[in-house]
Amino acid sequence: MEAVGERGLSVYLWRMVALSILDLSPVTTATPPAAALNNTLDLARFADRLGFTRYWLAEHHNLPTIASSAPDIMIGQVAAVTKNMRIGSGGVMLPNHAPLMVMERFKVLEALFPGRIDLGLGRAPGTDQITSLALRRRQDTTNEQDDFLDRFQEMILFETNGFPHNHPFSKVAAMPTGVPLPPIWLLGSSDYSAQLAAQVGAGFSFAYHFSDFPPEIPMLAYRNQFKRSAWRQTPHAILGVAAIVADAESEADRMATSADLHFARRALGQYGPLASPDEAAAYPYTPIDRQRIEHNRKRLIVGSPTQVHEGIAALAESTKADEVMITTMVFDHAARKHAYELLAREFELKKPLRLSEFDGR
């Protein structure tokens, strides 16, 4: 390969990966939850024209900062107002749901939007223990790992007609029949999830945007240990990254102060809508608050388009990511749209990479 400068290397690396969006439907002190959900539809329409490959919706419960609690419903709404991007869950928290119900909802989505739906599954409840109990209506909410494995295996047995003849579920069909389950992705923030995704032959998405785990370890472990399956012939690893970009570094840093304050308050058990940069500037931070913010900033890419480009490209190279999925939590919806516009322009997105390259089939 010909020698290239730092900027040229960044562009060269980027051409090897796709760029996608994870939308949490952020709630702010100026944006109530209903408006946040409508902002998601607005951003999805906008992103679909910019050339992003995927648009995923999250499942979180009882979090005042996030309106995204029902990703399957939002997927249908987003898919209906877009035409290019793959739309999926990032993810459905499987311990909260009956596997058959998850399958049927996503088969319906696949039937309505064939070839455009992704089923991302998470192992955590996406909430606190009390809310988890309210969701599941059972007393034991501590054995989530084993529960996930049981539910995931049940889902696979339904899809493959793998239940023994004498099993009561052998007579149950996930409807609509004749419609395949969308490509499965396992989400995680540690090497355990990466190893599990590799063993079952699923796609893998690593949540670096909230994990302290070095991303290179799980991302490379997944790729090295991947086993082909009926779902996927080759590994596909997505790196989830939190990024805030503006025309100038100073403006991006100002926008990021909303996330700084949210992180400082969350560490104290104080949850609320995302505050404005002005409120964040007036907050009386303690030395411990500032230490926590500094630590969190290490995994948050903030800056001008060029700076964010370099940061993302470096992570994509070190983790060998096939795709980078960006989440941007800022106070102003227009600023969030502009951030993705800047990313699309900086990375020279023209149109989404061909869906057949990423559907796992």
Regions found by a protein language model. Give the residues of each.
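Acidic (Asp/Glu)-rich catalytic clusters
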Residues: 48, 75-83, 110-116, 196-199, ...
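Flexible, glycine-rich active-site loops centered on histidine and acidic residues
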Residues: 17-33, 95-162, 204
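N-terminal beta1-alpha1-beta2 module of alpha/beta enzyme domains
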Residues: 7-85, 356-360
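A conserved active-site cap/scaffold subdomain adjacent to cofactor or substrate pockets
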Residues: 192-213, 219
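Active-site mouth loops of central-metabolism enzymes
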Residues: 23-38, 92-100, 178-188, 296-304
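An alpha-helical appendage that flanks or caps ligand/catalytic pockets
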Residues: 140-173, 214-320, 348-361
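Conserved, mostly hydrophobic/aromatic
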Residues: 19, 51, 59, 78, ...
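Structural preference for beta-strand elements that scaffold enzyme active sites
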Residues: 18-21, 53-54, 84-91, 116-120, ...
